[in-house]
Amino acid sequence: MATLEELDAQTLPGDDELDQEILNLSTQELQTRAKLLDNEIRIFRSELQRLSHENNVMLEKIKDNKEKIKNNRQLPYLVANVVEVMDMNEIEDKENSESTTQGGNVNLDNTAVGKAAVVKTSSRQTVFLPMVGLVDPDKLKPNDLVGVNKDSYLILDTLPSEFDSRVKAMEVDEKPTETYSDVGGLDKQIEELVEAIVLPMKRADKFKDMGIRAPKGALMYGPPGTGKTLLARACAAQTNATFLKLAAPQLVQMYIGEGAKLVRDAFALAKEKAPTIIFIDELDAIGTKRFDSEKSGDREVQRTMLELLNQLDGFSSDDRVKVLAATNRVDVLDPALLRSGRLDRKIEFPLPSEDSRAQILQIHSRKMTTDDDINWQELARSTDEFNGAQLKAVTVEAGMIALRNGQSSVKHEDFVEGISEVQARKSKSVSFYA
């Protein structure tokens, strides 16, 4: 074995980095230190083996627990509603402080940690869960729908919100295909509707920058057949929004509270699927002026309207949920519906003017094979007090007459005869306003 002098004479890599204390040690002392290092290496190897064994045991436990979780999560689940979520730490701290004050003993093994929950199952059982289950308790809220194990009642998964099937049926699945070019003679009404409904949805940043609060909704009123529903569908198509079509008579139910529940579910569904346009047709069915009545049916209609008022006040205009209502009896509506802050924009749909009637006739006949010499202005002058729906009926009648006569195209005389047909069916005694 080389002596210290020989080691000093040799040029070894890292000599400059050696500690001066090590260089001053004797051979015996270096051998002793080497043995100590060997012992430490053996200890570290033993510790490494122990940790490796513990890691393998832990992996086995994790695998076993995953298998148990998989077995427990097998469908079907029992459906339950979360009643309350409680923080057990606060409860235990309070009980422990009271027990300490009274000189009692505290059993640390039984102290609960974390959050607990109270759930009510579909089998009408109310169960307290000190351990919530596989769902993060911080994400649970009262009234949430969850799936629980039918034996242990542990929460296994969260379920989507439950809505009334009648409300789900109100959602228009197919996107409306109407455009503003399909609506004739309503340029002013289109502009007002775009300002109230479309712009707040598509350019919300502009309203925010200017500090303007967008209207919550709009009320369209006017005689039947003037294009209220058509314009609402065109508005929904332009905004790419979910379209919920509520017919107000559907909200009048036989049982007490059913109509109000439908209104609540409709607005909850609209918030979940935002941006959404809620279109309430024939609003006068539930929005009539309130009056004293002994009949339960009248009181139920009034309760439904009060729930509608509450929902109009309850959601912010920033929620990308807009309400469009249509009626042909604006004179019978309750003043509470018409006040500012609910249906802010009131849009009147009058009977079309002469130029508007000519435009509507051209829109409805643009896909028909017609002669070039049709005088649309003359036809418009002949259809005084016709609404949009009756003008469409004129074009249909003209097409049927041309088909009946074996013609290859629709002539001006066919439109004149179609006007006569519709005029004959038009009752002069019908009044749309009381």
UniProtKB/Swiss-Prot annotation:
Q: Which UniProt keywords apply?
A: Acetylation, ATP-binding, Cytoplasm, Nucleotide-binding, Nucleus, Phosphoprotein, Proteasome
Gene Ontology cellular component terms for the protein in this record: cytoplasm; nucleus; proteasome complex; proteasome regulatory particle, base subcomplex
* Protein localization: Cytoplasm; Nucleus
Entry keyword annotation includes Cell wall biogenesis/degradation: no
SMART domains this protein is in? AAA
Q: Where is the signal peptide?
A: none
Query: What does the record say about PTM?
Result: N-acetylated by NAT1.
Q: What does this protein do?
A: The 26S proteasome is involved in the ATP-dependent degradation of ubiquitinated proteins. The regulatory (or ATPase) complex confers ATP dependency and substrate specificity to the 26S complex.
Cross-referenced PANTHER family: 26S PROTEASOME REGULATORY SUBUNIT (PTHR23073)
Q: State the name under which the record lists this protein.
A: 26S proteasome regulatory subunit 6A
Gene name for this UniProt entry: RPT5
